[in-house]
């Protein structure tokens, strides 16, 4: 569920040594499954442990995860690095904004997840986004683009050389291609 690097584990052990005995860390997601999702780490004293918490044992401490955050912390990584600029604790939770779907989930859910988790974060750098409209009976994912992608001169490259290639590779035999249903209008909002 959560990977905590050796450096981060040592950091937590040091911090917890200054807390009351039996104190753990808590890893959580506020507003899980939404665009406003944020992850955090806090102290978890013994009296704050809930009956439905999941306890993840590590050498020298445990990480507590509340039941509501569990699915959104799948594949999360915590690391602690030190360089000339100082020290930093990082928590990467790729599924915090969208719960990871099972490999055997319906095709629509798997494609939607891929777009939200892999494609939209890249498009957001250009002020763009895409949504899955439908999957046709003959295996085409129909997408709608918005923001900076609408009217962008590079949309064909994004669709054919980027999204389509990845989807065909990831979902071989299920997805034959991608169709763009957007009525592109060039304007100030367009990235290129």
Swiss-Prot record:
[4Fe-4S] cluster binds at residues 149, 152. Its cofactor is [4Fe-4S] cluster. One of its GO terms (biological process) is iron-sulfur cluster assembly. Keywords: 4Fe-4S, Iron, Iron-sulfur, Metal-binding. GO terms for molecular function: 4 iron, 4 sulfur cluster binding; iron ion binding. Coiled coil: none annotated. It holds the Pfam family Fe-S_biosyn. InterPro entries: Fe/S_biogenesis_protein_NfuA, FeS_biogenesis, FSCA_dom_sf, HesB-like_dom_sf, NIF_FeS_clus_asmbl_NifU_C. It comes from the Bacteria. Binds 1 [4Fe-4S] cluster per subunit. The cluster is presumably bound at the interface of two monomers. Belongs to the NfuA family. Involved in iron-sulfur cluster biogenesis. Binds a 4Fe-4S cluster, can transfer this cluster to apoproteins, and thereby intervenes in the maturation of Fe/S proteins. Could also act as a scaffold/chaperone for damaged Fe/S proteins. HAMAP family: Fe_S_biogen_NfuA (MF_01637). Homodimer. This is Fe/S biogenesis protein NfuA. It comes from Colwellia psychrerythraea (strain 34H / ATCC BAA-681). The lineage of its organism: Bacteria, Pseudomonadati, Pseudomonadota, Gammaproteobacteria, Alteromonadales.
């Amino acid at each position: 569920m959560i990977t905590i690097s050796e450096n981060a584990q040592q950091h937590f052990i040091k911090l917890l040594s200054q807390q009351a005995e039996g104190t753990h860390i808590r890893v959580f997601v506020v507003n899980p499954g939404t665009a406003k999702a944020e992850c955090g780490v806090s102290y978890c004293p013994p009296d704050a442990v809930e009956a439905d918490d999941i306890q993840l044992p590590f050498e020298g401490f445990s990480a507590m995860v509340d039941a509501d955050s569990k699915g959104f912390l799948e594949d999360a990584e915590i690391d602690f690095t030190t360089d000339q600029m100082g020290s930093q604790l990082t928590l990467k939770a790729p599924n915090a904004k969208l719960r990871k779907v099972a490999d055997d989930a319906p095709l629509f859910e798997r494609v939607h997840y891929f777009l939200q988790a892999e494609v939209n974060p890249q498009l957001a750098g250009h002020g763009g986004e895409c949504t899955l409209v439908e999957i046709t009976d003959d295996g085409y994912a129909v997408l709608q683009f918005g923001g900076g992608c609408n009217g962008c001169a590079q949309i064909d490259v994004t669709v054919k050389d980027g999204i389509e290639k990845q989807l065909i590779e990831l979902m071989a035999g299920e997805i034959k291609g991608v169709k763009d249903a957007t009525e592109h209008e060039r304007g100030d909002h367009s990235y290129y």
